[in-house]
Regions:
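Short amphipathic alpha-helical segments
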Residues: 14-39
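Short, glycine- and small/hydrophobic-rich beta-strand elements in well-ordered beta-sheets
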Residues: 30-51, 55-59
């Protein structure tokens, strides 16, 4: 199992809309998340920053992320969410959400 933490900015004028959208995530998007081996997925907000955490339980992370990106309903969802977000300037090339390094964990 792989734990993933990510961060991204949120446009200040989109906070309420982003929270409304995520209060009713489309069932097809939730099904794709599950089909791509993502579990225990949460997004937290602090001011204009979003922190996402999930656990990946599959065997091929890159293939599952490509599968998610190829899903038509997920891509449609992203047309709503991406304009609300503000990627960090420090993100790696090709990243939208900036991956974070895990520095501590305990069960």
């Amino acid at each position: 199992m792989r734990r993933v933490g990510q961060i991204i900015g949120l446009q200040p004028d989109q906070i309420e809309a982003y929270e409304r959208l995520h209060a009713a995530v489309w069932p097809e998007v939730l099904a794709t998340i599950h089909a791509c081996n993502i579990r225990n997925y949460s997004i937290f907000r602090h001011g204009e920053q979003l922190f996402a955490y999930f656990e990946y339980v599959g065997d091929d992370y890159e293939a599952d992320m490509a599968k998610m990106a190829a899903d038509a309903k997920t891509r449609e969802w992203w047309t709503w969410t991406e304009p609300m977000q503000a990627p960090l300037e420090t993100r790696a090339p090709g990243e939208w959400w900036t991956k974070m390094k895990e520095v501590f964990h305990t069960d």
